[in-house]
Amino acid sequence: MRIATWNVNSLKARMPRVVDWVARFNPSVLCLQETKMASDAFPHSAFEEMGYESVHNGQGRWNGVAILSNVGLDNVCYGFDDGKPEDPDARIIWATCNGVRVASAYIPNGREVGHEHYHYKLDWLSRLRSHLELNNDPSENLAILGDFNVAPEDRDVWDINSFKGATHVSKPESCLLYTSPSPRDVEESRMPSSA
């Protein structure tokens, strides 16, 4: 199964490119972030014509995440199933695709350390952990894809000195994301060593 992710930063603006890319590479599953459209504006029929089922968690001109699949979409969950109030931001959607639990996630940016948006980001990451602890069977396949807005290692940014004390590289963000119940950074494991 070929699974891909793409922060499209406006699906309306990128739709021709997305259609071309999907036709060229034919992924089994494609996760999209920053669709920036309401749920009722999502082009389900265009993807259906290409052989894809689709689900979308939209929010108008902000955020928005989607999953496209040509191997089935079951058990769709919008947001977190963690017993807390619904998140007003459309930042995550879950579905089971051919036996793999897939999430398309757009983790908050955080703006700056100490800012209310940073605290929202930390809370969001805590909710992700809680959702996984409550709903994820460690023996089942899981793929969380998307725009994580977290760089856990110095080599993950072009100049670590310019990021000192900033969001994306803070210890609390990295600890919440990369010590969660099962995540393993596949991107890192397939990238060639810089040494």
Task: Name every feature range the model reports, one short phrase each.
Residues Y178-D185:
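Conserved small/polar residues in nucleotide/adenosyl-binding loops
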Residues T35-A38, F42-E112:
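Structured beta-strand-rich core segments of catalytic domains in phosphoester-bond hydrolases
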Residues K12-V22:
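Short, acidic/polar
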Residues M1-I3:
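Extreme N-terminal starter segment of soluble prokaryotic enzymes
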Residues S189-A195:
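Hydrophobic alpha-helical segments, chiefly the membrane-spanning helices
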Residues I107-L125, F163-G165:
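Surface-exposed cleft-lining segments at the edges of enzyme active sites
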Residues H119, D154-K171:
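Short, surface-exposed, charged loop/turn segments at secondary-structure junctions
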Residues W6-N7, V22-D40, V102, H131-D154:
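Active-site beta-strand/loop signature of hydrolases that rely on acidic residues for catalysis
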